[in-house]
Amino acid sequence: MKKLALTLSLIAITLLTACSGNKKADTNGAENDSITAKTDSMPLYVEEEDKTDYSKFVVQPTRIDTTVGDWEIHIREFYDGKKFKLGNQVFANYSLKVNIFKGGKPVFKGHKIDAKAVAGSNYIKDFILGMSENVFVTETTVYLNLSYCEPETDYCQTYILAFCANGQVRKAQTASESYEGDMDGYVFDVYDFYAMYVNELTQPQPNKAAIQKVLNKYCTKGFAQKMQSHTSNNNPLLGSGKFEFQWLRSFIVHSKEAGTNSCIIHYQIPGGKKVYKRVLLQKKPRTEYDFIISGVLDATEDELPSMSDGEEEDAEDDEM
């Protein structure tokens, strides 16, 4: 029960899925990492009429309508004709419709994303797709957290989508618990940080302000300043050589070791070599469970915490 409660709490805080109400608030390799979208032709953004009676569904759709800087963002869940019953309750398999403008020009118009596009080979019938109630926005990208869950359980997959100003949609699979099964907020944060940071570093034209914004969100002031000048090549957080976004498919966050404020991350590069890094964590002031990144050290496989069970799996592909 404790594990279930903690998992649901973490997912609710970050993703706000199965319990969401009808609210407004402020995705290469074996499979394609980008979602192929169906795009409706619209000269300007106009709210589409939706005659669906959502009161018959136990989970109400979430929507985001907000303006951040020169971004205008409209993302909503909608009923796309698929539903199922669980006991006496009716669940809708919601899809997403995305309309995003930047500088008054459309970047995504009528961009539709469904559960199969997000989950790929991890698609499971009668799991429901849910989105967070807010986005994180930089000069280059709009970031959206998603969950894909078995209704009324703690069995979930989590993802982060990056809607880029160049029209690309990238996807990274994240997790609500460490590889060893530790459920804590730092796991979400480390996954999300690496997804956002690598996305910013690997933009066609990396934007310094956008990179700094991600660093400031997840790192101490001193470490953020130290990392500002680094690129995707020979980066202390990533390792030697040039890091490619698709390598995040094998990205793993391990548990913090007892008595320490650090965790090991690792990923695999082409050829099978694994790279290990120890991420140093520091508690946020006046919080008990929230951590930010304060440094990074090289690590080895011998330093990994002991495994309780499970087998390592690669994350899904990263473009949609």
Residue ranges and their predicted role:
Residues 132-134, 229-273:
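Surface-exposed, charged secondary-structure patches
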